[in-house]
């Protein structure tokens, strides 16, 4: 079942976001294995990211094998992060 992971970093900037992507992805437009969609934007008071994964297992593998070992990233996100996650029960596209 597809899985959604959302992170919000209060006070984070686009520069923090780009530093994290550079440290954790193989390229700026190459999604990690299992990630289907990636959305990110500045909210005015931080960075909000929502990633859609093919499964919770793929998401967990990325977090455990790539994201956590890469931390802390120089110039990356400040802590703490606000996290929400869910299995996707409805997916409608135009």
Predicted segment positions?
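Short S/T/G/P-rich N-terminal loop/turn motif that feeds into the first structured element of a domain
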Residues: 1-50, 54-68, 75-94
């Amino acid at each position: 079942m597809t899985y959604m992971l959302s992170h919000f970093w209060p006070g984070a900037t686009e520069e923090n976001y780009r530093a994290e992507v550079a440290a954790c992805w193989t390229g700026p437009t190459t999604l990690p294995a299992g990630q289907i969609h990636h959305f990110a934007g500045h909210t005015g008071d931080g960075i909000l990211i929502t990633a859609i994964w093919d499964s919770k297992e793929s998401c967990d593998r990325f977090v455990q094998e790539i994201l956590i070992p890469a931390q802390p990233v120089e110039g990356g996100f400040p802590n703490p992060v606000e996290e929400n996650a869910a299995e996707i029960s409805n997916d409608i596209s135009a």
